[in-house]
UniProtKB/Swiss-Prot annotation:
Family per record: Belongs to the prokaryotic/mitochondrial release factor family.
Lineage of origin: Bacteria, Pseudomonadati, Pseudomonadota, Gammaproteobacteria, Enterobacterales
Description of post-translational modifications: Methylated by PrmC. Methylation increases the termination efficiency of RF1.
Name of the featured protein: Peptide chain release factor 1
Primary gene name: prfA
GO cellular component: cytoplasm
InterPro entries (alphabetical): PCRF (IPR005139), Pep_chain_release_fac_I (IPR000352), Pep_chain_release_fac_I_sf (IPR045853), Prokaryotic/Mito_RF (IPR050057), RF-1 (IPR004373)
Keyword flag Signal: no
Length: 360
């Protein structure tokens, strides 16, 4: 391992001890925001320092085994020990490289999850509902909170569009690779001939940014319309114009919110989603520029992005970005998403490592 990397790891080890001391300080404990931030940093540093200690232990084992090679009686055993220690050292070095990759500052944030029905009419809306249920189940397994911000229900079930805020530890970092197009192949309940139909929906995952960090939105750039809240089939939820539609004129971004009875609450929710969408659009531009010369696994939420196909007759789900196919569709739809998320996270990390080595 490069001496510069070892020096960086030694500095992180010192920081780990420093943060531990802070966490025992009464003034830090009294400041909940600082205590929470330091606790997160401590957890991240703990993984790095543990791995670094194990790597150093492997180096000691290599050194000891090499010294034993000169002893004829011990040589065979020493060669075996050297082989094991070197393999362990290489494995730990790879783990350390991943742990040292630049962290996306948004990874620890909550997120907004948007699911929109695409081609396929009623079946697309039903599939969007199935997708929302899948993500909600996944959130339950990770003890995350799901709050619907806005929903437009389909006439025969599901959603034309649903926006939810998902809160918890590391939500955006875990879900950000879900952005893009999702396609379903199955026989709709309304299909009398038993023919397989293809429908689609798009998913967009955006970090939920605190109000103070959101891009400044000029009030003159907004058109705000109020209308009467309605449920599926036009049935009125209430008789006041409490629903809000906000249009950001420069970008054409439109956000509707009608889930709350209070117009003020609907406007606050809509503004938070609008701010996240504007920021996400800016980030997307930047990502496209940076990724022009290499593939980008981070979906843009664009309809042209084809992330996955969910084939119900075959019980198959395929992630087209990494050519991964699993015949475990029932489990996936019940929210067991780690089997799909982890491989793409690993692929993304491998791409990052490759990009860093090219810079070196």
């Amino acid at each position: 391992m490069k001496s510069s990397i070892v020096a960086k790891l030694e500095a992180l080890q010192e920081r780990h001890e420093e943060v531990l001391a802070y966490l025992g300080d009464a003034s830090v404990i009294a400041d909940q925001d600082r205590f929470r931030a330091l606790s997160r940093e401590y957890a991240q540093l703990t993984d790095v320092t543990r791995c670094f200690k194990e790597w150093r232990s492997a180096q000691d084992d290599i050194e000891a085994a090499e010294m034993m090679l000169d002893d004829l009686e011990m040589r065979e055993m020493a060669q075996e020990e050297l082989k094991i220690a070197k393999a362990r050292s290489e494995e730990l070095e790879q783990q350390l490289q991943v742990l040292l990759l630049p962290k996306d500052p948004d990874d620890e944030r909550d997120c907004f999850l948007e699911i929109r029905a695409g081609t396929g009419g009623d079946e697309a809306a039903i599939f969007a509902g199935d997708m929302f249920r899948m993500y909600s189940r996944y959130a339950e397994t990770r003890r995350w909170k799901v709050e619907i911000m806005s929903a437009s229900e389909g006439e025969h079930g599901g959603y034309k569009e649903v926006i939810a805020k998902i809160s918890g530890d590391g939500v955006f970092g875990q879900l950000k690779f879900e952005s893009g197009g999702h396609r379903v192949q199955r026989v709709p309940e309304t299909e009398s001939q038993g023919r397989i139909h293809t429908s689609a929906c798009t998913v967009a995952v955006m970090p939920a940014i605190p109000e103070a960090e959101l891009p400044e939105i000029n009030a003159g750039d907004l058109r705000i319309d109020t209308f009467r809240s309605s449920g599926a089939g036009g049935q009125h939820v209430n008789t006041t114009d409490s629903a809000i539609r906000i249009t950001h004129i420069p970008t054409g971004i439109v956000v509707e919110c009608q889930d709350e009875r209070s117009q003020h609450k609907n406007k606050a929710k809509a503004m938070s989603v609008l701010g996240a969408r504007i920021r996400a659009a800016e980030m997307q531009k930047r990502q496209l520029a940076e990724a022009s010369e290499r593939r980008n696994l981070l979906g843009t939420g664009d309809r042209s992005d084809r992330n996955r196909t969910y084939n119900f007759p075959q019980g198959r789900v395929t992630d087209h970005r990494i050519n991964l196919t699993l015949y475990r569709l029932d489990e996936v739809m019940e929210g067991k998403l780690d089997m799909l998320i982890q491989p793409i996270v690993q692929e993304y990390q491998a791409d990052q490592l490759s990009a860093l080595s090219e810079q070196d």
